[in-house]
Amino acid sequence: MQTEFIHLRTQSSYSFLASALTTEKIVELASSYKMAAICLTDKENLFGSLEFALYAIKKGLQPIHGVILNIQYETGVFAEILLIAKDETGYKNLLKLSSITFTTNDRKICNHITFEDLKEHQEGLITLCCYTEGVIGKCLLANKEEQAEMFARNLQEIFGDRFYFEIMRHDLPEEQLIEDNYIKIASKLNIPLVATNKVLFSKKSMHDAHDVLLCISAGVTKEYPDRKTVSENCYFKSAKEMIELFADLPSAIENTVNLTQRCYFAAHTNPPMLPNFATKDISETDLIRKEAKDGLLARLDTKFKSEHISIEHQESIKTEYFARLDYELNIICSMNFAGYFLIVSDFIKWSKKQGILVGPGRGSGAGSVVAWSLLITDLDPIKFGLLFERFLNPDRISMPDFDIDFCQERREEVINYVRSKYGNNRVGQIITFGKMQAKAVIKDVARVLSLPYKFADYLTELVPFSAINPVTLEQAIREVPELANAAKGNGLYNLEGELELIKLVLDTSLILEGLHRHSSTHAAGIVIAGTDLVDIVPVYKDANSDMLVVGYSMKYCELAGLIKFDFLGLQTLTVITDCKKLLKEQNIEIDFNDMTFDDEKTYQMLCKGKGVGVFQFESVGMKDALRRLKPDSIHDLIALGALYRPGPMENIPTYIACKHKLQQPDYLHELLKPILEETYGVVIYQEQVQRIAQVLAGYTLGAADLLRRAMGKKIKAEMEQQEEIFVKGAIANNISEAQAKSIFATVAKFAGYGFNKAHAAAYGVISYQTAYLKANYPAEFVVACLNLELNNHDKINLFLQEAKDNNIKIIAPNINISGGYFSVKSVIPRLDCGIHGDQLKDTAVKPQYDIDSSIIFALGAIKGVTPNFGKLVTDERNARGAFKSIVDFIERLPPKAINSKLLENLIKAGCFDELHDNRLQLFLSISKLLAYSVSYHEEQASNQFSLIKVSSLSKEILVSSDYADKNTLAFYEFEAMGLFISNHPLTEYKEIFNRLNILSSADLHNNLPDGTNRVMIAGVIQKKDSRMSARGRFVTLVLSDPENIFELSIFSEEVLKDYVHLLDVKSLVVVNCDIIKDEGGIKITAKSFSSIENATGNQQFDLQLYPKNDEELEQIITLLSARINNDEQSNTIATIYLSNKSVKNFVAKITFPEKFFLKGQDFEILSIYQNT
C-alpha cells in the first residue's frame, strides 16, 4: 500500500490518564486509514511496546517504537524529547533511557534523563526535538533565539542526520508564535522538519470525554480554573487532513514516511531465558539427576521409618519410586527445564534452612516425584495418586510453573536471597495495571462533572459486582433495566432530577472505561533472568522500593522470554509458624514432616463442624458439610476441598451418602473401580479423568491431559475429535460403542469442573495441619490466628467466640498484663520434651499441655493502639515493674507516645480497671491527664525538677464523676474494640427472651429443623453494609448476642424504609425473620424489626414469685412499686405466693392489680424468687 503520511506522535493509555486510546485502538485506526506503519510514543515508558508491536504485526502494519522523555540539558533546563528506535541497538537504548527516568536520576522535579545519558545511549536512535515542549520551542517562547540555536547544534552534533525538528499545527497560539523562527533555525542548520499531530483520542467528538480524563488525572472538576487542557485537534487525523494542514510544508509530511523507512526493528517474543545453574564441574542435567536421586533416598528413608515399612517391602517401593523418578527426569531434561527445577529447589532449600515455613505444594507441581525429591514439595505424589503429566505434559511443551507458598511474614527474606544470588539487575517484580472499571469510572466521571453524590453512589450500586469477571458498564446497561433507562436520558427510578447529567456521566464513562489508571506490582510474581532485565524489557522502580519492576504485564513478560516464579505469602503458614513458636515456649516441638494424618482428636473436632481458623474449612457451608461428611481420613479432607466449589458442590450429597453406605457408588465400569473407589464413584479430580482415558481407551497420560483440557474448554470441534478417539480406544478394549459414548459424556460433564488433585492434596495437608493444631492446642492456635488479624475486629470477634466455645477464658485488656499482641497465659511449668507432629498421642512421655490456658487480650487490638505501643508498655513494665496508678502510667510513658484517642480507647477498653474502678471518671479526665503528662515531663527535663512541685501538679487531675452503668461500659468496649468483652448489652434480657420465645444465635444452629423457619432473634447491630445485586439494592447487618455473631440480609425496600430508624450501628433490635437452614448453612432474611423496649415491654406475663421471708417480700414490693406503669404496653402481671414457715404448702396468694414495665435486668433480679 502506498503511504503518504505516518503518525509519529501517538500516545496510549499507558501514558496514564493522558490518552483515551488503547494500543489496540491506535493500531486499528492506522489500519482503517490505510497507513503502512504506526509509531507509539508514550510518555516516559515503553510498557505497551510488545503488546503494540504484536497488534501491529497482526494487522500487517510496521510498528515503530518511540518514547517521549523529559531531558535535563543543564541545571534548571528541562524539556521534552521524542526518541525513536531505528534498529535493535536503538530499541535497547530506548529501554535503558526510559528505565533511567525511573531508576537513577533525582526524581523530585520530574522523571528525566540527563544530556549525558542521551549522549551515552544515542546509538540506533532517531531524535525529534519536540515542538513547543522541546528545548528549541521553549527557548523561542522565552525570546532566546541564540540559545535555541545552540541547543539545536548540540543535538545535531550527537545525532547528525538522525536529528529532526518536530512541527505541529493544533491551532494553538504558542505554536503560531514560534513557527517562523523555528523553521528558520531548521533551514539554517539543514535540520529536516517532520510533521506530527498529538494523537490522544480517536476523533474530534471525543475531546470532551478526554477533557474529563485530564480532570480525573488532576483531581479537579471541569469548572476548576487554570487547569490543563489540550486542543480538540489532538485526534487521529487522516493522511488527507495532515497533507492539507501542511500544504505549505510538503517535505514535513514526506519526512514522516522517510523516517519510518529508516526503522526496521519491532519488539518480539523470545523463547524462555533462565540463568544458567551449571558450574564448570557439572552440567544442569547431571546436577539435577544427582540431587534428585540423593533427595529421593532421603525421602524414602523418612517414609520407611514414619510408616513402619518392613525391610522386605522397602526394595519394591524403591524400584517403583526410582522408575517414576527416571521417567520424570528424562522428560524434564529433554525439555531443557533442569535449570528451572534447580533454581526453585535452591531457594526453597535455603528458606527451610533459615526456618522459613514453606507450603507442602500448590498447583499441579505437587504431582512430581522430582519436585518432592528436590524438597520443592512435601507431598508424596505416588502415595496420593498424583500424576506428573498433569504438571508437565510430554505431548504439549509448555513452561512448568511452581507456585510456592511461604510464611507471609518472611516472604521478603526469600526474595532478597534470590536477588543477592542472581543480582539485583536480573531479578524483578512484575507490573500490573489498574484499569478504570465500571464502578470506578462512574465515580470518577461523576465527580468531575459535579453530579451530586447521591446520584453517583446510586449509579455505581446499580452495577453488579463480580470479583472474578468484572462486569463492564456496557454489560451492566444491557442487564440492569434502571441503568438502561438512565443511559437513555430518562433518569433514575428512585431519584428525581439530573436526567441530562446522568446520561452524560454514563456516555463519558462508556468512552473512558477500560483505560489504564495507574500501575502497581503483582502480589507474588518475580522474574529471574540470565542477563540484566533492562536488556530485554522496560524496567522501573516504585518510589517505595529499591527492587526493579518489569514494565510488561505478566502475559507480555512471559512472551518476552522471562520466567515467572510465584513467591506467595500464605497467612495460614504464618499462623502455623506462630502457633509452633508459642508451643516451643512450653517445650512442645511440632514437626509435620513425618505426619501420619490419623489423629483421632482432629477428626472428632472436624466432625462437629468446628472449622473456624481451619484452612479452607471456615465458611458456614463448609462447616455444615464437615458435620454431614464426618471425615475420618486425609482423603476426605482433600475431596471436600475439591468439591466445595460452584458446580461440584452438587456432588457432595452423593459423596456423603456413598461414604456412609446410604447409597451404592456408581463406578461407570468395573475397570474404573480402582480409579473411582477413593471418591465413591464421583469424578472429582482432573487426574481421574486422565486415568479413565488411559485405562478405558488406551490413552497415554500425556494424551489424556490433552483430553482433559479439551473437556474443560468444551470446544465442540475438539470434543468431537476426542470422543472419536476415546470411543475407538474403548471398543478396542472390548467396551461397546454405546457404553463408551455414555461414559465419555458422563466424564465430560464432571471434567468441566474437575479439580487438580495435586493442588487439592497439598492444601488438604495444610487444612489437616491447622485442624491438628486447633484440636490439640486450641489456645495457642487461636492466639496465632488473632495476631494476624489485629486490625480486623470482625475476625477478632469470631476467634474470641471460638475460644469461648472451647472453654478458653479471655482475660480483658489490662495495662499490667497485656502486650502488643495476644498471648497465652499458662499456669503449668514448662518441661523439656520434644515431640513430633500427631505422634504425640502415642508417646509415653508427654509434655504437660495446659488445657486451662487463658488468652490475654492484646493492646494492639484496641482501636488507635499499635503493637509498637504495646511493646513500649511491656518494655517499661519489664524495666520498672507494674504500673501503680493511671498517674504512674502517665509519668512513665513519654508524652509523644500518648494522644487523646489512644488514651480514650485504653480507658474505654478497661485497661486501667485494675488501677482505677471508675472508667467514666478516667474518660472525663483525659484532657487533664494529657496536660499533666506534658507538665510532668517538662518539669522533669528542667534543672529545677521538684518532687513537691510534681506532687502539686498531680493533685486533682481526676474530675468528680458517678459510675457508669453496665450497658454504658459495654458500649465503651464496643467503641474501643469492636466487641463486647466484660458484658453484652443483651445478657440482662435472657429471661425475658426465653419467655417471649426470642431465639439466641446458638439456637439457630442447634434447635432449628432444616427448611424455612419464621422466628424472632435479638441482637446488637455491629456492622451495616449496603450492596447491589442484579435484583437491586440489599443491606447486610452483622449482629451479636451473648452467644455469637451472625449476619442477616434485608432485601425489601419497604422494610428498609419502615425501619431505617432502628438500623444504626449499636442499636438493640428484635428481628422477625425467615431462616433457611440447609446443607449450605443458614441464611437469615429480615421481615420486620422492633426496638428491644417495644419487643419486651408489650407482652403479658404472669410472674410467680415465692419470697421465703419478710425481707424478701419487702425487696419484691419495693422493686415492683418502682415499675408500676398502667399504659397499654405494660402488661406484666405479678403474683406473690406466701408460704407458712412451718408448712411446705402455700397458704396465700396475692395478685397485684397494677401492670408493670419490667426491664431485662428486673427479670434477672426477680428470678431468684421464682423457685419454690
Curated annotation (Swiss-Prot):
It is an enzyme of class 2 (transferase). Pfam families: DNA_pol3_alpha (PF07733), DNA_pol3_finger (PF17657), HHH_6 (PF14579), PHP (PF02811). The keyword RNA-binding does not apply. It catalyses: DNA(n) + a 2'-deoxyribonucleoside 5'-triphosphate = DNA(n+1) + diphosphate. It is found in: Cytoplasm. The keyword Transferase applies. GO terms for molecular function: 3'-5' exonuclease activity; DNA-directed DNA polymerase activity. Its EC number is 2.7.7.7. Keywords: Cytoplasm, DNA replication, DNA-directed DNA polymerase, Nucleotidyltransferase, Transferase. It comes from the Bacteria. GO terms for biological process: DNA replication. Belongs to the DNA polymerase type-C family. DnaE subfamily. NCBIfam families: polc, PRK05673.1. This is DNA polymerase III subunit alpha. The lineage of its organism: Bacteria, Pseudomonadati, Pseudomonadota, Alphaproteobacteria, Rickettsiales. The gene is dnaE.
